Design a protein with these regions (language model features):
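Residue-level detector of functionally pivotal "anchor" positions at catalytic/ligand-binding pockets or at interdomain
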Residues: 290-317
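N-terminal catalytic or cofactor-binding beta/alpha core of small enzyme domains
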Residues: 18-290
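Boundary of Sec targeting at the N-terminus
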Residues: 17-18, 316
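Sec-dependent N-terminal signal peptides
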Residues: 4-15
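Extracellular Ig-like/FN3 beta-sandwich strand-entry sites
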Residues: 321-323
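C-terminal tail/sorting-segment detector
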Residues: 325-342
Length: 342
């Protein structure tokens, strides 16, 4: 005989660190060069190369242009995640400066040179990312940074870089597995318990999920390795903000094929990418990201199953708390991870 356990999910109203940023609202740095849209999901979207501002007092120090379509696609991705989670908000950090005057995917001296305003914008970009990471760590216990770029490689695919280069992806599974602790998803695939090969190139990898929706992607079951093709396997920011060196926030370097981000494809691609991101997070992190005002999740449990204790992510026994990931330990040895959002 079974009984139903009902979990009520309510509209989120989560505080953000000491500043209490409001989910869905924009906050700007000096001169509006950098924008932070606060969120309440364990998802961060980084947009470093979509800006077009070229103030006269900021010198051109980089010979590079905008990742065309990345600004618009990132905003559509943001909107689509809100829609597909029934009102939850991802975090998003945007550089509005043209990357030729400040390139936030490099260390500061290379990125901004000696110009004080450019250097300040660099700090703002990364400080806003750190703010969102701090909030996610406190409220969810883990999360993921997705940095949006564009590529024009002749293979015509979106590239998902997790810190594993083509030299390893082109090799055996055992060779790929040897890179687990050197990847930008180290936390997810060690402490988080996710299968590294699946996260890298399986059907439920981000590339696999996107590829299954008709958008050619690598790595994925269709393209398990780049072979000799073009492939960006990581960037300075995904090393910095992912879990390679520390922390519980993982990172993906998302090199979107530029044609996918063109006007004719942009809406559908963004919608499919958002669904892929949400599926990836739910599958590998075990999250339920749904901000429906009144919705019920039904979980079947055996009638003789008794709750022994509830613990936080550090294993400390704790009473039930909202907006916090908790572990429910039962007398049959099973453990359930849940978060109740209000």
């Amino acid at each position: 005989m079974k009984k139903l356990l009902l979990i009520l999910l309510c509209l989120p109203m989560i505080g953000f660190g000491q500043n209490n940023f409001i989910p869905g609202q924009s906050y700007f740095g000096q001169h509006n060069y950098v924008e932070y849209i606060a969120g309440n999901l364990p998802i961060i979207i980084g947009v470093p190369h979509g800006g077009t501002l070229m103030p006269a007092n900021l010198p051109v120090i980089h010979n590079r242009g905008v990742d065309n379509g990345s600004f618009e696609t990132s905003h559509l991705l943001y909107d689509s995640i809100i829609q597909h989670t029934n009102g939850c908000f991802p975090h998003m950090i945007i550089s509005h400066l043209h990357p030729s005057v400040m390139n936030p995917v490099r260390e500061i001296d290379t990125a901004a040179g000696t110009n004080i305003e450019a250097r300040n914008a660099w700090y703002e970009f990364h400080d806003f990312i750190d703010t969102s990471k701090f909030d996610i760590t406190n409220n969810w216990g883990a999360g993921h940074y997705f940095e949006m770029h564009g590529n024009g490689h002749s293979e015509m695919w979106t590239e998902i870089g997790l810190g594993v280069s083509k030299n390893y992806l082109n090799g055996s599974d055992s060779l790929i597995l040897s890179r687990t602790n050197y990847s930008t998803v180290k936390h997810l695939c060690t402490n988080g318990g996710a299968d590294f090969l699946e996260v890298i190139k399986g059907p439920t990898s981000l590339g696999g999920l996107l590829d299954s929706k008709g958008w050619n992607s690598v790595p994925s079951p269709s393209n398990p390795s780049p072979d000799t093709g073009g492939f960006f396997y990581a960037g300075w920011n995904t090393w910095k903000h992912g879990s390679r060196y520390s922390g519980v926030i993982d990172a993906s370097h998302v090199e979107n094929y530029y044609v996918f981000m063109q006007t004719s494809n942009r809406n559908q691609y963004s919608s499919d990418l958002s669904n892929s991101v949400i599926e990836f997070m739910n599958i590998h992190y075990g999250f339920v990201m749904d901000c429906t005002t009144t919705s019920v999740i039904k979980i079947d449990t055996q009638s003789n199953k008794q709750l022994l204790m509830t613990t936080d992510i550090l294993g400390q026994e704790t009473p039930c708390r909202k907006n916090t990931p908790l572990f429910y330990i039962y007398d049959d040895g099973t453990v359930e991870k849940r978060i109740v959002i209000e």
